[in-house]
Amino acid sequence: LVLVGFACEQKVQVEPVAEKVTSPDISNKQQPEITINPFSPVDVSPMDMSYFPVDYPKIKMANANIPPPVARLIYSRPHLQRRALFNGVLKYEEPWRLGANEASEINFYKTVTIQGKKIPAGRYIIYGIPHPDKWTIILNSNIDSWGLKQDASKDAGRFEIPITNNDISLEYFTMVFEKTDTGAASFF
């Protein structure tokens, strides 16, 4: 790894320019539609994070001496853009990296138990395989791999999650944690 930096201490005199500055025309760019998302406010930036406990960064700012969070999800937020989710974006029985641009990552700051299986503290990519009646969610230790070719030999755990349907159509993919009586659940 080679890092190169340049600095200059010369003073440069800049003459003011009396030119009219106009904003670029963005009328031909896609503008986000107003959508309702009952799970989390939508940040239209391509990257998002979810913590457990929820709002951990705010809690830490109020008290710097608290322990690390239990988990953090980092993902790029894809959206449908009027496409059909299945047969348009995803296919049943094929892996999806649960996000756009990069492999989504989950970091556990301590050992957690998911469906009775202990997962050691660490950083994992998280991806899923959709089936008509359930999803297989996979935690994999092959980090920094962009998530396009999964190496099953590095799976830390596979979990079958039944599908729950609702009547809400969401434009933006969202992953959030929610506190439960037994710990936390993550919703996609």
Locate predicted features.
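Sec-dependent bacterial lipoprotein signal peptides
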Residues: L1-F6
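Early exported N-terminus immediately downstream of N-terminal targeting peptides
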Residues: P53-G88
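Extracytoplasmic
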Residues: P68-V70, N101-A103, I119-A121, P132-K134, ...
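Surface-exposed, gly/pro-biased binding rims or lids
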Residues: D144-A184
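Mid-length scaffold segments of soluble, non-membrane domains
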Residues: K91-K149
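Short, exposed beta-strand-loop hairpins at the edges of beta-sheets
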Residues: S186-F188
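Bacterial signal peptide processing site
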Residues: C8-V12
